[in-house]
Amino acid sequence: WIMGHMVDAIAQIDEFVSLGANSIETDVSFDKNANPEYTYHGIPCDCGRTCTKWEYFNTFLGGLRKATTPGDSKYHEKLVLVVFDLKTGSLYDNQAYDAGTKLAKSLLQNYWNKGNNGGRACIVLSIPNLDHYKLITGFKETLTKEEHPELMDKVGYDFSGNDDIGDVAKAYKKAGVTGHVWQSDGITNCLLRGLDRVRKAVANRDSSNGYINKVYYWTVDKRASTRDALDAGVDGIMTNYPDVIADVLSESAYTAKFRIATYDDNPWETFKN
């Protein structure tokens, strides 16, 4: 999965997919009542990027739905996965459940079209704080209450705080999550980060009793670091330059082992090294 980083304006969906992304990451900020409000990152952000592009969250979902609904004039067949980077740092811990509830209602209405031919991409809820695991509970219980529990088949999870792998496992246990787990590891492109924790995450994925299904590394903009991440066995790379990742994947060293995921590839299924 080539994951376009910080796609916060509808116009950027076309831009990143045309550069080779089959997945995008979108920032979601919340108001003080835990309503998802904007797709917005803000300053500071990655080096070389404009930090202030934004839409209202529900407006963005409408654009995303069009981009992932077959037959729509804006449809992109290859856009199959969306990571929502949920900026829950502005919330109190006890608002996490409400945030999950409100997020589910927004997606149900504006992305899934109440279960009637909505957008088809799979969604990863990426949460920065392990203490906010109840966001998952709120999300799940709301879809059940709204009589669309089947949409949970399209939803996965990520805790993005670079926490100890054992602590992440405990948070999932509390949330009752037993699959659909992506594990991120990374840092802004302005700084360097080694691959030690990525290797631990890959080892967990590849073990018989691990909780991780997929591992992605962020934010990778250079060919050398792309090769290092692929050599470590990641499933996804988040980048500001999807064309760079696509170029490296076309090198002879990688074409035999990796291919770009399509809609038919299950993003919750584990492939071991």
Curated annotation (Swiss-Prot):
Binds 1 Mg(2+) ion per subunit. This is Dermonecrotic toxin LsaSicTox-alphaIB1bii. The keyword Lyase applies. It comes from Loxosceles sabina. GO terms for biological process: killing of cells of another organism; lipid catabolic process. Pfam families: GDPD_2. It comes from the Eukaryota. Its main location: secreted. Mg(2+) binds at E25, D27, D85. SUPFAM superfamilies: PLC-like phosphodiesterases. Keywords: Cytolysis, Dermonecrotic toxin, Disulfide bond, Hemolysis, Lipid degradation, Lipid metabolism, Lyase, Magnesium, Metal-binding, Secreted, Toxin.
